[in-house]
């Protein structure tokens, strides 16, 4: 027990000695400044505190054998005073550390908050740019769809909008390519015949029938514009060659102008007129047959 008390006294003496050194240095600094100015209250407080610390250190440095009998009753009181003083100093030091830590944290919080604000602003800007790009992409897709519909309705005469269009357009408005949606193979490595077979398998029979009818109507329309010739299929829709018929009409007109004088001479004879007309028609038919062959 005596060794433990001695060890505790040594710890208290070390703490008091450290406080005494700081107070003595502060008092010396105030004393050097007081030569130029009047002594302040701080100087007097430091001086009294130094005197108290010196008394505490002397009390702790006393040996048990040198303690007078009249001082033994006041030993507990003095030790309690020393303990209270050290506790107050420890509490003050803790408060100072907390204040210092708080003052260091506040400047760090300001750049952190500024960084968070900048990051949130950058995120908002990125979201706005993404929404704008998505809106632009949607408008471009809508323009492409409208252009395709207009080209089918206006640019291709004689063809109607077949049921292929709904199958190439999804319900949400996005354009779907049946060639790429039915198979993961890239269209760049596929043969045209493979893409055609896949497209034929992916559409319904009604859509395929409508597409075939549209193709037939276009081919028939082109043949009729260019002129048909005798034969089978769509090229024989008129039954005669338009070019040959035009030449026959021109030759018939020439014959009519040449036979004008003969008709005047035979105007009084009905049989002559009838024979002339039959002969001219026979000549036109014969010429047409020769041109066709």
Swiss-Prot record:
Primary location group: nucleus
Any single Gene Ontology cellular-component annotation: nucleus
Compartment(s): Nucleus
InterPro entries given in the database record: MED15a/b/c-like
Lineage: superkingdom: Eukaryota
Molecular function per GO: chromatin DNA binding; transcription coactivator activity
Family: Belongs to the plant Mediator complex subunit 15 family.
Quaternary structure annotation from Swiss-Prot or TrEMBL: Component of the Mediator complex.
PANTHER family recorded: MEDIATOR OF RNA POLYMERASE II TRANSCRIPTION SUBUNIT 15A-RELATED
Record's function text: Component of the Mediator complex, a coactivator involved in the regulated transcription of nearly all RNA polymerase II-dependent genes. Mediator functions as a bridge to convey information from gene-specific regulatory proteins to the basal RNA polymerase II transcription machinery. The Mediator complex, having a compact conformation in its free form, is recruited to promoters by direct interactions with regulatory proteins and serves for the assembly of a functional preinitiation complex with RNA polymerase II and the general transcription factors.
Name assigned to this protein: Probable mediator of RNA polymerase II transcription subunit 15b
Organism of origin: Arabidopsis thaliana
Name of the encoding gene: MED15B
